[in-house]
Amino acid sequence: MKQGQVLLLALLFMFLTGCTTTPPKDQGNLCSIYREYPDWYEDSLQMQSEYGTPLHVAMAIMKQESSYVADALPPRDYLLWVIPWGRVSSAYGYAQAQDPVWGEYKDNTGNGGSRDSFDDAIMFIGWYTTGTQRQLGISKWDTYNQYLAYHEGRGGFSRNSYRSKPWLMQVAQKVQKQSEIYSAQLKQCRQELEDDRSGWF
């Protein structure tokens, strides 16, 4: 391979990897997250305005699902416990939305979007939690049950599938606690974020 081709490939690799947003440095602090990525705050506000899902609820769900990794994938599945055999599901991106429900979201909203784009992923979570409230009567502020329905699907939640998964109920409690922490943190820095936001325009 010629030296020029090697250089071109190296530059292309650097460009592609540079386009990926790295996860926030302090994922446990919502103020730190929004300070690091102020556009995420703006995207979260747009989601809340359109769907009414509280920022701290949507962000707690996203943290649990992907740890804010843009191209997050579920664990690999294995044949005979050793041979890699695809992934355990089609979940992908910030919101870990699976192919069928992502397709439903795009059809219902007209949003082409991408699962590895934060603004599209946060809007998806808002859309899904709104549908859960409408279909199952679960408040958008009820992080615990919203997360169970998000993880199991609304049909699975209706069948109480989570009750046979004590580990999942513990995870849902963890997400609930994280949302409470996020909510308290946001109250401390909301004015600062709004002041910074007003300076953008």
Description of each model-found segment:
Residues 28-34, 44-51, 84-92, 107-119, ...:
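Second-shell loop/turn segments in exported
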Residues 84-88, 141-193:
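Catalytic and substrate-binding regions of cell-wall glycan-acting enzymes that process beta-1,4-linked
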Residues 15-18:
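C-terminal motif of bacterial Sec signal peptides marking the signal peptidase cleavage site
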Residues 94-145, 149-157, 175-176:
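Alpha-helical segment that forms one wall of the substrate-binding/catalytic cleft
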Residues 20-79, 133-136, 186:
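Export/targeting segments at the very N-terminus of extracytoplasmic proteins
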Residues 72-104, 147-149, 167:
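Short, surface-exposed glycine/acidic/tryptophan-bearing loops
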Residues 191-201:
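Low-complexity, Gly/Ser/Thr/Pro-rich intrinsically disordered linker/tail segments
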Residues 1-7:
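Bacterial N-terminal signal peptides that target proteins for export
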